[in-house]
Design a protein with these regions (language model features):
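N-terminal strand-loop element at the rim of the active site
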Residues: 12-17, 24, 28-73, 99, ...
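An aromatic- and histidine-rich active-site surface loop
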Residues: 93-114, 276
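Donor nucleotide-sugar binding/catalytic pocket of nucleotide-sugar-dependent glycosyltransferases
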Residues: 144-183
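A conserved mid-protein helix/loop that constitutes part of the nucleotide-sugar donor-binding site
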Residues: 20-25, 193, 202-216, 282
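Acidic donor-binding loop of glycosyltransferase active sites
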Residues: 263-276, 289
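Conserved acidic donor-binding segment of nucleotide-sugar-dependent glycosyltransferases
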Residues: 305-306, 310-317, 324-332
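Nucleotide-activated donor-binding/catalytic signature segment of Leloir-type glycosyltransferases, i.e.
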Residues: 236-259
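A short, well-ordered alpha-helix in the C-terminal region of glycosyltransferases
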Residues: 326, 333-347
Length: 366
């Protein structure tokens, strides 16, 4: 039996990244009982405002040191939120991703009687990610929450191992797809299969493994294209990528550029050496792209092996190369994977995610 939908306020105060797109997708399916608190400094703020959703805009900061020097704004932000909660009779506040300031307003929100829900994306920091240094502070948000939501069983397990007190109030949902479009059905006519490595270039993303896998596949005589798109340090990998004729876009891509880049490729490749779950997988599936990934973290929960993508046998260049070779050589498999991605778009839709979040009223977390 379907429960009554909670009147919900979603909070995301980050400036850029996949959660901005996550929020835009939520605004498309939100009902009249839904509010969104968004930073005016968000790179997609204009697009979010134009969505027509009910927005509670706040001023945060545009540079890292603003987290400290901008704290004087927090009192005003707190008043804005509490007024909105009262005016719209909000039942539930959902933090889509903790911000350095959200632990400071958690207690005030809970005192209104609204349930405070925090989505935890990572149980601990990722190697090479500078935001890892604030992970312990951000965890204060989860520890204050009435309920914690993770997007994979892997993260829930790691989170409870670190904070056993969260076991009774943590639930697992799923990472919804972003920008659902029709699956391509295989390689574009008249050109080789294209593989894309996408997103911020950080140590845990395993770009060296991707490059080595491509070198192995090229040595086997296979014809394919590759692209690398995202900001981060390439170092000596730049020369090796050039030797592979890779198309390199080594910077942050804006919203429209993402669509242009992804439309040029047939398969996303993740060669992570560590992962929680991945917004890149959610984006790829939204674009109808199968995903090849290493068997780490929650990636094996997002990607259904031989249904919506391929999971390499192990975290090694030759294993990734084997999976990529299978994708290149087996046209029937490519068609099968595209059909599987279409099913993922349905099963992991943002509409289902929104429904699950807003209908879980006051039930005890299982």
């Amino acid at each position: 039996m379907t429960s009554v939908r909670d009147r919900t306020l979603f909070i995301y105060w980050g400036r850029r990244g996949s959660i901005s797109e996550f929020l835009i997708e939520l605004t498309k399916i939100a009902d009249d009982g839904t509010l969104f608190s968004v930073s005016r400094q968000n790179e997609l703020f204009g697009q979010i405002i134009r969505s027509g959703a009910c927005i509670v805009p706040v001023d945060t900061f545009s540079r890292g040191f603003g987290a400290i020097f901008g704290l004087f704004r927090l009192s005003r932000i707190r008043r804005q939120l509490l007024a909105a909660i009262e005016k719209y009779r909000i039942d539930k506040v959902v933090v889509l991703m903790s911000h350095v300031w959200t632990p400071l307003i958690a207690d005030s929100i809970r005192r209104t009687g609204a349930r405070y829900i925090v989505i935890v994306h990572d149980a601990s920091g990722h190697p090479g990610d500078r935001t890892a240094i604030v992970n312990r502070w951000l965890m204060r948000d989860a520890l204050k929450a009435d309920e914690v939501v993770t997007l994979s069983a892997y993260v829930k397990s790691a989170l409870i191992a670190r904070f056993p007190q969260l076991e009774g109030r943590t639930v697992v949902l799923f990472h919804p797809v972003i920008r659902s479009l029709a699956a391509s059905g295989g390689a574009r006519t008249g050109r080789p299969v294209g593989f894309l490595f996408f997103g911020r270039i950080l140590a845990y993303k395993g770009l060296p493994l991707f490059v080595e896998a491509c070198e192995l596949l090229r040595a086997r005589g296979r014809d394919f294209r590759i692209g690398v798109a995202g900001e981060g340090h390439l170092g000596d990998l730049a020369g090796r990528l050039a030797a592979l004729d890779a198309v390199i876009i080594n910077r942050w891509l804006d919203y429209d550029e993402v669509s242009t880049v992804l439309s040029q490729y047939d398969c996303m490749v993740l060669t992570n050496i560590e992962a929680s779950q991945s917004g890149v997988v959610a984006l790829a599936h939204g674009f109808g792209m199968p995903v090849i990934a290493t068997p780490v973290g929650g990636l094996t929960e997002q990607i259904k092996d031989h249904r919506s993508g391929l999971i390499a046998r192990r975290v090694a260049a030759d294993a990734s190369a084997d999976a990529m070779e299978l994708f290149v050589t087996d046209g029937e498999l490519r068609k099968q994977l595209s059909e599987g991605v279409a099913k993922v778009q349905e099963d992991f839709s943002m509409a289902r995610f929104f429904e699950r979040l807003t209908e879980q009223r006051s039930e005890k977390a299982q």
